[in-house]
Amino acid sequence: LLKGVKELGFTRPTPIQADAIPPALEGRDLLACAMTGSGKTAAFVLPILQRLIDTKRGTTRALILSPTRELALQILEDINDLAVHTPVTVAAVYGGVGMGPQEHALRSGVDIVVATPGRLLDHMKQPYAKFSGLEVLVLDEADRMLDMGFLPDIKRILRHIPAKRQTLFFSATMPAPIAALTREMLHDPAMINLARKSAPAVGITQAVYPVRQELKAALFLALLAKGDMREALV
């Protein structure tokens, strides 16, 4: 595993990797707010690979849920790069392609499955999709899955996998439905918040004018009269 990391040119962990990998290696649940491009994929892949290197092959032990086919394929590529010198096997399960090769991977008990929710549920209707030995569940970009309407699918998937497992939950934002889902899924999680703080767009200047309620209209008209604004949206 270290050889693969070295060949990829990794010399020091990113902040999310430094914060997430230790509790993940300890087997703790994890709730992490981190943006795309922060290195979060390696933050959950490396602990999974470390856990699975010496386990018996033939049983799917890790499931990674992704909102899109493109992200699933990127995660698959990252796992293959990191696991190149290990016996760990991985397959991606997503829509828009035939189910045959995916069925073969599930029948063989590939170690790690990276999947989009809809296609995974299609397979879960069949007896060959067995997840009784699952040890680790990862939700990547959970807020995007919410935006795409996958929350009911995620809840259905949870009914097909063991309740006793490690869950690693990654989301760039934490809207109320996602926060509620974390309370259902996670047990005493390690909490990491590296989400980018909101900032005004480039070229936008923000200002605050403390003013009494009865003077708001007069202040607004005075600001417009100054002529500093070419366009205004109220």
Q: What function would you assign to each model-found segment?
A:
Residues 130-139, 143-200:
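Post-DEXD/H (motif II) to motif III coupling segment of the RecA-like Helicase ATP-binding lobe
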Residues 2-3, 7-10, 57-125, 133-136, ...:
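Conserved nucleic-acid-binding Ia/Ib motif block in the N-terminal RecA-like helicase ATPase lobe
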Residues 26-32, 58-62, 110-111, 229-231:
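Pre-Walker A (Motif I) flank of P-loop NTPase domains
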Residues 5, 17, 32, 48, ...:
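Residue-level signature of catalytic and energy-coupling elements of molecular machines
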Residues 18-30, 41-57, 70-82, 121, ...:
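Walker A/P-loop NTP-binding motif
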Residues 34-38:
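The conserved Walker
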